[in-house]
UniProtKB/Swiss-Prot annotation:
Alphabetical list of NCBIfam families matching this protein: S16 (TIGR00002)
Location(s) in or outside the cell: Plastid, Chloroplast
Span of the signal peptide: none
GO MF: structural constituent of ribosome
InterPro entries, sorted: Ribosomal_bS16, Ribosomal_bS16_CS, Ribosomal_bS16_dom_sf
Protein name: Small ribosomal subunit protein bS16c
Organism of origin: Nymphaea alba
First-listed, main subcellular location of the protein, grouped into a coarse class: plastid
Keyword Nuclease attached: no
Length: 86
């Protein structure tokens, strides 16, 4: 099963995160299937590759709680529902 989750990057005490699609059995720093976004909690910046996220969600990927909250704030799930009703 594939999950959308955060991968820690950056320096000590200055964490940034990549949002990645990764196999659920892999460790946090393991090899990812694809990078689908970026999140910096200190600067409060977020970049999401929405088509890639929608692709993985349609294939059955499950977002973690934090990734779900970030995606919800960016209104990614509204686009998912629009695509499903077509």
């Amino acid at each position: 099963m594939v999950k959308l989750r955060l991968k820690r990057c950056g320096r000590r005490q200055r964490a940034t995160y990549r949002i990645i699609a990764i196999d659920v059995r892999s460790r946090r720093e393991g090899r990812d299937l694809r990078k689908v976004g970026f999140y910096d909690p200190i600067k409060n910046q977020t970049y999401l590759n929405v088509p890639a996220i929608l692709y993985f969600l349609e294939k059955g990927a499950q977002p973690t709680g934090t990734v779900h909250d970030i995606s919800k704030k960016a209104e990614v799930f509204k686009e998912l529902r629009v695509n499903q009703t077509k």
